[in-house]
């Protein structure tokens, strides 16, 4: 294979999956085939999309009801020659799913890149091992928390929040994705002030915390804004990838003057991936493509919290982020939304140690504040790695958290 193989879930009311697959393969490449003169067929053969696989799925009444017609469901695989497109994500996505995305009854499940094609993508600059080296934390999941309620607040408020989270043992604190450039907490000032706080905490408590700052602005200003952030001392860049595009992420990741990890936020991605019938699958969008384009971290809804993905989907995202690939470093999985300490055993059981446990309200909502919330999570992580049930741990911060949010994982064993 020298090009790319696209896997689709299709719904066909003509009940002829093979014909539908061939129509897609031709429609996204040379347009027609059977009526072409033999000589022209020979000339265009190397550009033709090829149907590799057609598999009929069981009938699904809910799908028929939603579409208001009876359809035949199937999985098809089509190979697109590398000759047809330039080796960049805009060209790849337009080739494999451009006008087809308007069908409304086709979902792009996966893209399998040839080795030749993979060479054109950077992958994570740091990856899991690089991030762990920055923090000197190698034996446990990382803990991340989020600034909350920063809109309309000043630098003093940010510094207080940051200090409390760092003292609580949080490894990474990230901006809220809706915190943009503003007069009260401008980008450079956030970074400089934040670094002062984190250095003070490190000198006092010996705990290192990294700050992920939200890089925003117009598309053609992003590189300059990212470089300003780096010059000010940014540890990590948070980036709302899907508000801009995967190719923009790649351009940031490939820039040698932006030598810091990039954290990809899933904001807007639901517009592409939420439907089970059409769009782009979450594992492909939030897993494989983010990793290839250069994300060191990928945030996505966990199977447990307030904005939940199905467990199978969440684990598939993580698989794409962390599976062995000689071309790319591994990216950190960051299952998010509604996470509290009682979920820690689930997260470690399902995602392993190479995961970032990300909490907002589960840290800030603790009775002892963000310090208590962070300590509760760290205690839960340590107990889980020792295979000790959380309810048996004698720790006031963890006990308080379990009283508030519950302990759904009390029977979980690693």
Curated annotation (Swiss-Prot):
It comes from the Bacteria. The keyword Disulfide bond does not apply. SUPFAM superfamilies: RuBisCo, C-terminal domain, RuBisCO, large subunit, small (N-terminal) domain. Mg(2+) binds at residues 174, 176-177. Binds 1 Mg(2+) ion per subunit. The keyword Isomerase applies. Substrate binds at residues 148, 174-177, 265, 338, 360-361. One of its GO terms (molecular function) is ribulose-bisphosphate carboxylase activity. It catalyses: 5-methylsulfanyl-2,3-dioxopentyl phosphate = 2-hydroxy-5-methylsulfanyl-3-oxopent-1-enyl phosphate. The modification N6-carboxylysine is found at residue 174. Pathway: Amino-acid biosynthesis; L-methionine biosynthesis via salvage pathway; L-methionine from S-methyl-5-thio-alpha-D-ribose 1-phosphate: step 3/6. The active site is at 99 (proton acceptor). GO terms for biological process: carbon fixation; L-methionine salvage from methylthioadenosine. PANTHER family: RIBULOSE BISPHOSPHATE CARBOXYLASE (PTHR42704), RIBULOSE BISPHOSPHATE CARBOXYLASE LARGE CHAIN (PTHR42704:SF17). Catalyzes the enolization of 2,3-diketo-5-methylthiopentyl-1-phosphate (DK-MTP-1-P) into 2-hydroxy-3-keto-5-methylthiopentenyl-1-phosphate (HK-MTPenyl-1-P). NCBIfam families: PRK09549.1 (NF007095), salvage_mtnW (TIGR03332). Homodimer. Belongs to the RuBisCO large chain family. Type IV subfamily. This is 2,3-diketo-5-methylthiopentyl-1-phosphate enolase. It comes from Bacillus cereus (strain AH820).
